[in-house]
Amino acid sequence: DALPILILEHLYHKPLINPDDLYKELTEYRDMVAPFVCDVSLYLHNAIKEGKEILLEGQLGSLKDPDHGIYPMVTSSSTLAAYGAIGAGIPPYEIKQIITVCKAYSSAVGAGAFVSEIFGEEADELRRRGGDGGEFGATTGRPRRMGWFDCVASKYGCRMQGTTDVAFTVLDVLGYLDEIPVCVGYEINGEVTTEFPVTHLLEKAKPVLKTLPGWKCDIRGIKTYEELPENCRKYIEFIEEQIGYPITMVSNGPGRDDIIYRKR
């Protein structure tokens, strides 16, 4: 196709691609992935029969789902756990556990309603400290929009996912705060609701905040839930009560092993 070549040359001012070099590169990629190409549905079907455990991973949150998200600020295919069965080609009833990953605060990339959003120095500080090296887009490096934990949106997201467990991440980031606001409701047209509204009402929503005391210390390296500072545990338990789903995992650092498991 000549069009991509013309775009490459005249729009991006890049050298023309040599077809032989491109073919060689693609052949190398083919050889890399060839051992992993198979009938995925059959492969997983046999694994289930053998009693093996299967982990399916999704990306993006419930609010990006084209059917149940904040349309039109959504993606092109379903982001809900139920769609995992369709994508993998396995029966829905084989999915026994659904782990929903929630940050201990909120962040977002791009436009769309963001009720608990914060601005200015408050947002800059959380953005700088957040994530693994700051809250910036992985591909573009774009600064993410920042906000406090939103119980209303998270409760809705967990419900749509069919959550059995919540993994509560980047909790260590909040250790610098004296007080931590949490969005526990939305005020819309003078009335307060704790249920996630339809999109046109969401645009009018103002956050109802409850402030919890911070723990003002570094919690990295802690291995058991009981060792966490009291105010840290209270924060987790307050969120759990508000969203109505069990927080069974808490991450307190960027490492693979920086996870505290809670008993139900």
Where are these regions (language model features)?
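Non-transmembrane, aqueous-exposed alpha-helical and coiled segments at domain scale
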Residues: 4-264
